Amino acid sequence: MRIFTGSIIMLATASLSMAQTTPQVGAAAPEVTLPSNEGKPISLTDYRGKWVVLYFYPKDFTSGCTSEAQSFQRDLPKFNKADAVILGVSVDNSQSHKNFCAKERLNFKLLADTDAKISEAYGSVKEYNGAKLSARNTFIINPEGKIARVFTGVKPQTHSEEVLQALAELKKS
C-alpha cells in the first residue's frame, strides 16, 4: 500500500510539474526549429501569418498515433481552407517520420524532436521505460505566434475534429 501511495504522489507531482511548464493561452509560442520528414529544418516562424496546429504524439507506427495522423490527413482539406498548417512532433527521427508519412500517405510535415527539447518547452514530455516520449498534447498557434488554444491528453480518433471546431471558434473572435 505504501508503494502504491508513493507511486500516486510521484505521478501527481510529475503531472503538476508538466502543467507548470506548458505554455498558456496568450503566451508567445516557444520557437521550434527541427528537421522534418523531408530532412529540411522547419521553424515555427516560417509560418508566421498562418494558424498553426502543433500536435505532439508519442511514436510513429503505433495504433493511437497512426489513428490521430490519419484523422488529421482526412481533415487536411478543411485545415487548408481555414489557412491552417499542421505540424506533428515526436521524438522519432526524420527517417522514421519519412517512412511513416509514406506508409500512411500523410501530406503534412512531421518534425523530429530526437532530444525532446521542444517537447519539454511545450510541457509535452512523458517517460516510458526510461525513455522520453512526446506526450499527446496539441497547441493552436495564432498568426501572430501566440498560443491560442491548448489541448492535453487528447483522444486520437476524434481530436482532429475537436481542433477544427476550436479553430473555427478562434477565427470568429
Report each predicted region and the residues it spans.
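N-proximal helix/coil linker or "cap" segments that precede and/or mark the start of modular domains
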Residues: 3-31
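A short beta-strand-turn-helix
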Residues: 23, 32-51
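Short loop/turn microsegments at loop-to-beta-strand junctions
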Residues: 29-30, 51, 135-137
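Short active-site neighborhood of thiol/selenol oxidoreductases, capturing the structured segment around
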Residues: 45-66
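Structural micro-motif
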Residues: 106-108, 125-128, 132-139
